[in-house]
Amino acid sequence: MQVQDYLAGRCLTQTEVQEVWKSTDARGQKLETWLASLPSKPALTGPPWVCGRCGNQDPRQFWTFQGLDGQPRTYCLDCLSLGRVMSGQRLYCQPAPAGRPLSQSPLTWQGELTPSQAEIAQKLVETWRGQERRPQLVWAVTGAGKTELVFPLLERVLMDGGRVCLASPRIDVCLELAPRLKAAFAGLNCQVLYGGSQDSYELKPLTLSTTHQLLRAYQAFDCLIVDEVDAFPYVDSRALHEAVRRALKPGGLLVYLTATPDDRLLSDWEAGRLVCQQLPARYHGHPLPLPQLQWVGDWPKGLAAGRLIRPLKQILQRFGHLEGPKLLFVPHIPQAQACAKLLKPLLPSLALTSVHASDPKRQDKIMALRQGKLDLLVTTTILERGVTLPHCQVCILGADDELYTRASLMQMSGRVGRSADQPSGALWWLHQGQSLAMRQAIQQLGALNQTAQARGLLRVN
């Protein structure tokens, strides 16, 4: 690649830019002279310190040490995972140039949108082609087909010569979307960027990325779509919000996708800071599954003692004998691991294991469940989003745990009934007493079904 292919649309540290110099024909110039020719800004300004990459201003999120020259040096802790942004150094930021319009459509997807999907898709395209590109919120229930819903927008932006990024806070979501996006736009070379990915950055028309990787982007995209916008870590990260803002070109279109908008998004909608398009029904026209609630007593105490208490044991035996892949959600990692260990002798005919966010074999285990090599996966909330399994059965143990919010309960429940040939399934919430989040989730699931029914979007009552 040429030097500009590495730098365009990016915000890089001095160390990263020096690596570009080493690996390109820029080596023909003196490093200092070449660096001085590039547009740049201070990596940190202050004190009080402000990070030029992520916008961090929290004095607790900076670290000062004594450099080799005896002078104090400060760096940002908020975006440290992508390399140090340090005082006395510079950031090199270059906007991406305009892209080239395409002569023919890059969309190879042969599917068909439902009328309600098509209506929202058309509104997004009209917003892109209009004079005022106000931020858009697509509030579509789990299983509504929100990824396919944005295909016409992607097609139009790409045809017009724009660059598009579909970003998500979760690696699992990116890995779920990657094959679908590549199949839908088979003529384009779509790059997938996340920590540890095989793809390296190039200036391409279509990018799939984690929101963390956007910390390296600068005015790179004409259209930026953030999927699962209410998910951790994006939802609570000022740095990632800043990364999204900076990655979008001036005048670009920002679209948020979620099934469970948080209070901030709803407030922005009510205040007119964004436009909301709501889709309260799944693509197959069946209602969202509602949970069966079951009191199971003090199961954490039993688990800590190395046993499954009788009510829980009986329920999990029944759950294990259900057809199809099974997800057993457990609030905390030690509980998930202990539960999987106790389930193996209880359900000897099943292939099962546990999984969590820091599990190095996480992707292998998810793939094994997809392929039928695993029957049951005991999981934390890491699989509440971005995993679509036909005929999936779900049991949420400790549904009343304070870790579980209204949104997380709805997302976990949303793994059930996503396929048209089996639009329902087991959805069990096991608890020691109903929590406020449980009541809120049940209320919203019911309200969404009622809205869908009132709009004539459901095929069944």
Stretches found by the model and what they are:
Residues 168-176, 180-182, 190-202, 209-216, ...:
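Conserved helicase motor
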Residues 249-264, 413-444:
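Conserved segment of the helicase C-terminal RecA-like domain
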Residues 219-297:
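Post-DEXD/H (motif II) to motif III coupling segment of the RecA-like Helicase ATP-binding lobe
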Residues 138, 273-340, 350-352:
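Conserved interdomain linker/interface between the two RecA-like ATPase lobes of SF2 helicase motors
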Residues 221-227, 376, 384-400, 410, ...:
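A short beta-strand element within the Helicase C-terminal
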